[in-house]
Amino acid sequence: MWNIKEEDLDQFRITCRNRLSPEGATGFMMGTIIFVSLLMFFIFVALVTDGWDYYSTFFDKIIVSIELVLYSLQIIFLILYLFPKARYKFQKLQTLVVILYAFQLGTITFTALVLPGMTDYSIDRMTLICVGLLFIGAVIVHIVTTIDTFKQASEGAFSMDERSQSFFSETKERMIKGSMVYNLVLLIIIYFDNDYDFDTLILYVVGTIVMHAVAIGAAEFQLLVYCRFKFKSFHMTWEENERIRKRNKKFKTKNK
């Protein structure tokens, strides 16, 4: 579909060795797990005090079950990647794990809003439909931005020559503007359907912004997965990383 060449990804390779390096990805994982844990705490408290009977509907039980499975996987992978050598030995797997973390980060706020006990506000059928549409919108945004990112990569947008372009292309800008209108309409419907106060509306706005920001940013993660699995230059061994680290340390010491 796309003829992505390794030599056309010099700029993205630099990004992968800095912000998207195994250490950078582990930092993202740690930040995400802290945020997610704050909201998962309410689920654990409800299960410990009242058991599964606290979640009366089949929908609630399904959502809680999914969140528990995802959270358990996140904990397991985080423990694995806390070991420096494991980050490099399993760095291809780590790219997939980062996408899992991104999904959890983007959706956990709405989990907090729709499950009973996590807020003091009731959720009716219309609100659930609107939340579902917000999620579908984010999925569409992610698909379009991912396709556009791969198209940019095939055209040399992430190279270091005259073809170099910003990650935020015209396609992404149009998608962002369109999603803003789409999300605004759904948020207005949620607000008037439930007669929420302003503070609750802010939670929905924040959740929407986070979800769509992750949907757009995760397109870069998808390209990282592709590059790590296909191109050797995107795969750094532990020994190579140690040599570079020692060289940089020696250079900094020399310049002091």
Residue ranges and their predicted role:
Residues 1-31, 229-256:
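N-terminal juxtamembrane cytosolic/stromal segments of multi-pass membrane proteins
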Residues 2-3, 68-81, 138-158:
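Membrane-water interface of transmembrane alpha-helices
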Residues 39-45, 105-127, 179-203:
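Alpha-helical transmembrane segments and their membrane-interface junctions
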Residues 54-67, 122-144, 207-212:
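Alpha-helical transmembrane segments
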Residues 66-104, 158-170, 174, 227:
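Cytosolic-side membrane-entry/anchor segment at the start of a transmembrane helix
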Residues 77, 95-121, 252-255:
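C-terminal halves and exits of single transmembrane alpha-helices
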Residues 150-171, 232-247:
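Juxtamembrane inter-helical linkers in multi-pass membrane proteins
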Residues 174-256:
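C-terminal transmembrane-bundle signature of multipass membrane proteins
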